[in-house]
Every structure is written in C-alpha cells, then in structure tokens.
C-alpha cells in the first residue's frame, strides 16, 4: 500500500542546459526564450496585467496543468510583486496558485533548472527552500509572508481533479493549460480534464495554452469555454485562449459533507491553545478581524501548556484518511514552524518510535508498508537506534528524521503575541457559558458577566468544545493525563532524539536540564490533579518496555515534578474541523439518507459556527494544517486537502457514515 508516493521526474539536461523529460522526450521550456514565452502565452494570454488592478476580490486564483520547473509560477509571482508595488491600495492583495504535477522534480534538479533565469532568483530561492517531498496529494506552501499561496498537487491531474472538494468549484480566475505537447503526452489532454477545468472556472475566468491543436480547442468548447486562436509566440504560428462565459449550476457530489464559508470577515475564537493561536494568525493574514476569548488568565494553560511536546506523524496503513492526512500535516507543520517569525524552544533532533515487543513491531511494519520517503519515515535497527539516539534499546523501530520536540507553551504564547501585533484582540479570563444565534449574529455570554456579539464563532477550546447546547452531541471525549518532569543523569543526557514506546521520553531541555516523560491516560477524566500513581506509572512503563536498559532505571520521579492536562479525542483518531453540525436537523433531514442520496440536502449546520478540535495527543502535528484548512474554508478560498480526507475530518462524519448505511445514530 503506497498510495502516498509519486514517481519523481526522470530528466536530463541537454547541451543548452535545458531540462528534458526522458519519459516524454520533450523539453520543460523553450531552448530559445522560455521566460518570454511564458509571459506571452500565459500572462498576456490571460490579460493578467490588465485584470489585476480591476480585480474585485482580495485574492486572485490561477490553476495550472503541469508545474514542471515552476517557470510559469515564478514569472507570475514576479509580475504580481510588481503589480503590488505599483498598486498598493488595490483590492487585490494575495495570489493563489494551484498546480498539478504527476512527476515532480527532485530539489537538486529544480535548483539546476532555475539557474537559467537569474532574474527570477529571489523568488526561485524561496520556492526551493520549501520544495516538498514526492508525496501524493496537496502540499501548501505559504510564500512572501502569506501573500502568495502555492498549492502543489502531486499526482495525475485527471485523477486529482476528481478528488477535489466541491468548495473549489468555480474558484479559478485563470487557467494555465500547460504540460508536455499533446502529441507527446496525450493522456493528460483529455475531455475529462477539460470538463474539470470548466467546473473549477469562475464565470468570466480565462484560459491560455501554447497549443492550437484542434481536438484541444473543440474539447474546451464542448466543456463550456468560448475559444479563439491567437498568434503564437516566436516561430509558433498559433495558440489558444478562452473565456468561461457560462455560469453553470453545479450539484454537490457529497452534500452531507458540504463546507461553507462567510462573506463577513469578522469572528471570535474561543480557546487559548496552539490551535486557536495558529487559526487567529491564519485568519489575520486573510484580512479578518479576530477576537480571542481565553477562559484562563494566560495562554496555553490547557493541553498546549507542556514544556516539551514531540512532533511526528501518526501513521496507519489501515485508514486511508489517516495515511493521507498526517504526512501532509506533518510536512506542513515543519514548513510553518520554520517560517514563523517567532522564537521558542525546540530541537528538530528526530523522533524514533520503538518496536519493543512483537505487537509494537507489527504496528511499525505496517507503518513502513506505506513506503513513505525516508526523509519522513525510515526503518532502523537496534544499532542504528543506538547511533542515532545515543542510548541502547535492544530493539528496532521507525525513525522520523524531520521530527523532534518543541515547547508548546512558548510557541502558543509567541504566536498569540505575533497575532496581537497584526491586530488580534485578546481577552483572558473569559469562560464562555453559552452562545445563541439571534438576528444573524452570535450572542456570547461569559461567566464573568460579560456579553459579546460576533458575526461568527470558532470553538477551539479543547475538551470544553462539547460544553454547549450546539455541540453536546459531538462524538468526542476527554482524556486526562500527567507528564512527568525528570532531572537528567549522566546516561540520560546522552539522549539525542525523542523516544516513543508505550509512552515517550524527550532529550533534556537545555533551558532547565529536565526531560519530559509521559503521559498517563485517563479516558473521560476532566479534573486532573497531581497523582503519585501516575508519576510512578510513567516511570514504570519505560522500565517495562526496556527491562535490560540500565539508563531506564535511572529515571527519577521523586521530585513530584509534573504537569496535568486534558486532551480531546475521537474514536477514529482523526480531528474535527469545519462547520458545527446541527445534530437534531441532521437526524431529521438524513433519516432516509441511505435511500435518497441523489436528493439529499446540504449538511445541516449552525450558520457561522465553526470548530477546530479533537486533536488528541497530536496537536503539534495537526494544528497548523487544520488552522489553514479552516481559515481557507471560512474565507471561501481553495482548501489544501482532497475531498475524501476532508470527509474524514468533518465533524458530522461518524453520524453520516451510519446514516449512509441505514443505521441508527442514537
């Protein structure tokens, strides 16, 4: 099962230094003047320089077939930067570029190709710095401090466009129809692709392509574009441009998982942890007015308050949603954490998950069957673990080289401070008692007697997310736990990576000379106080997993130094993000869903009420991408995730799955 892996480009460089595909026997760009051809065919062909100053929305969306070396994207980014410098007061402030690539270049080849265009170096270097691994699905790159978003979809465009969420329909303002020539790559240039382009095109959207092949022109016309021939670039006689003049009604393919956003960009976030902080930052970058209400006197007093938390993905070969979501979330988290202009304690030292017994080794074997790139997950034997971690474990495992640890409390506080400098309003000591929807707004009442009114509300308050009448039926549950803080020893200070077993142990934090070891697990428990039994249990689990390891016996928990917290989890180990579903209306509207899928109504939700929760023990890995997904949804922008995986993150998923099978929810 290797659904995540894609084949990198198989190329060589010709005498002119131009990359040539060995598989398609075609150049990636013109030997003569690829840069000028891109400007002529795609920028002028779509009239972008004239359209940018008049664009009525804050974001312009371009979609492309065939990313290749990124020449089209870099050229457009350069032009967009010039537009912003010339028109700083224009409505258009952000560029969103969506590109599909079946055979992505490896980073080394990308860098070599970019040497052709020194005038694009300042943009190319930023792309190279975030260039993703060859994993299938969507890689979101946030560039130029979020002003430019690049969604790289790795895989076959004809398959990927079928997997896009309905929320992407009619979002594209301009199409760059590129790729290897139709004669060299006929599979891509299909009626299927042309229909997908039409579905994604906003009414009034344009397209341009270098080819003038008759079947391409006819196929695009049949899909709904008005097409015309134009003079081609240089020695090419003709090319094609087109306009989507129609406004087609597009029925939802899975209305029970429909996602909706808002026109009014004002919201309140309830919470105070890492999810709240990152969501606030993502919304502010999109021009939202955001107010954060935190029940505690300071940020990160809940599950995000630990001194050290491990960053690594949850892997499973048994659940496609998990195997698609977590590698994407993990790689996005690393890109975001490295790019954030904040300071916090962290060390990307790697994480090693150990197969200390037969059952845990079987679990690791099925993780490795995913065939992920070694930069994400790689098998390691006992000697390699000793070499990598500094401590003997007498067992094999799986290593996450890009993982490590960070201080969630410091990161959360730093991101909130950064968001405040961008306009975030924060109120501490505001515990939300109730919220009610009246006359188009949400009325909030807090336990300190204060009231507030907001256009929309996001619940991101950990295990308290189900405290309200609108959310009390959500299938989530609290998990209390205790993390022990232990002093280092001559043996423990050798530990260079995070160790995960039937618990976890971090390398020492140089700021305090302590390690974190944890964590106990008490399902259903919301009131957590220091427990000596939990303290001893954290130590004993380590000793039990490695009975021959003398270093494990050195762990000293006698200081009674620990931190308690409560996580929020789900039965299927996936978080929940999106509109808050209306439970009673869902049961009423979908009581016969199994027989009436063709006539099903859009998912019943509370208008303007959203949630980001149930992150379990993987919030450091998942919060960045979940915040980006929700900010995109709320802003009615393209969402960086396929529809099947998004369905696996939908807050109503467990109810709908039963209803689709004709089973009772209650």
From Swiss-Prot:
Catalysed reaction, written as an equation: 5-aminomethyl-2-thiouridine(34) in tRNA + S-adenosyl-L-methionine = 5-methylaminomethyl-2-thiouridine(34) in tRNA + S-adenosyl-L-homocysteine + H(+)
Annotated region (FAD-dependent cmnm(5)s(2)U34 oxidoreductase), positions in chain: 270-666
Gene Ontology CC terms: cytoplasm
Keyword Protein biosynthesis: no
Localization of this protein: Cytoplasm
Example GO biological process: methylation
Origin: domain of life: Bacteria
Primary subcellular site in the record, as a coarse category: cytoplasm
Listed SUPFAM superfamilies: FAD-linked reductases, C-terminal domain, FAD/NAD(P)-binding domain
Gene3D superfamilies the UniProt entry points to: D-Amino Acid Oxidase, subunit A, domain 2, FAD/NAD(P)-binding domain, Vaccinia Virus protein VP39
Keyword entries, A-Z: Cytoplasm, FAD, Flavoprotein, Methyltransferase, Multifunctional enzyme, Oxidoreductase, S-adenosyl-L-methionine, Transferase, tRNA processing
Cofactor names: FAD
Annotated spans, tRNA (mnm(5)s(2)U34)-methyltransferase: 1-245
GO molecular function: flavin adenine dinucleotide binding; oxidoreductase activity, acting on the CH-NH group of donors; tRNA (5-methylaminomethyl-2-thiouridylate)(34)-methyltransferase activity
InterPro entries: FAD-dep_OxRdtase, FAD/NAD-bd_sf, MnmC-like_methylTransf, SAM-dependent_MTases_sf, tRNA_MAMT_biosynth_bifunc_MnmC, tRNA_MNMC2, tRNA_S-uridine_synth_MnmC_C
Enzyme nomenclature, EC number: 2.1.1.61, 1.5.-.-
Family annotation (HAMAP family): MnmC (MF_01102)
Family: In the N-terminal section; belongs to the methyltransferase superfamily. tRNA (mnm(5)s(2)U34)-methyltransferase family. In the C-terminal section; belongs to the DAO family.
Protein's job: Catalyzes the last two steps in the biosynthesis of 5-methylaminomethyl-2-thiouridine (mnm(5)s(2)U) at the wobble position (U34) in tRNA. Catalyzes the FAD-dependent demodification of cmnm(5)s(2)U34 to nm(5)s(2)U34, followed by the transfer of a methyl group from S-adenosyl-L-methionine to nm(5)s(2)U34, to form mnm(5)s(2)U34.
Protein name: tRNA 5-methylaminomethyl-2-thiouridine biosynthesis bifunctional protein MnmC
Organism of provenance: Enterobacter sp. (strain 638)
Gene from which the chain derives: mnmC
